[in-house]
Amino acid sequence: SLYRFQIDSNIYQMSTEEYELHLRCFKQEIIQYNPFFNHFSRVGSIMPKENFISQNFDSKEFTLFDDEPIYHSHLTKSILPEGNYAIRYCKSFEEEIKLLPQFLLDIREQGYQIIGDYLCEVIHEQPSLEEQKRDMFIRMQVRIGKKVKNFNLNHFRN
């Protein structure tokens, strides 16, 4: 399951401190209504398909990948759609932002079309605020479908 949480700022334009504050707010919102919830990992973000395709790298939605039921009026629950996903990995948000245009280009060059929102999933994270960086392992993923080949309708006419 995906639990989605709207925020007012673009995740990709946040400083380390801003990101950490928003992340803590997200966690507090969950714990407020689910005091025994203790699996706060695999947090990420969702970028609408249209933003990803137009290279407007703007995400204002945190997501938590978890199968444990979470109850909260501000969270939207959804299921990760079945299908094929293009996947790439990186080590930081800075690297992710640099790779996003190439990731999109690679998908298109392989003959696929984007059919879902872009998902960033932080698989591993260890903050180091003293050094102003985070030790991370990020999965970049987007649902894809095979492009329909153009065909000539005149071929079928007599």
Which residues does each PLM region occupy?
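A solvent-exposed interaction/effector surface
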Residues: 1-158
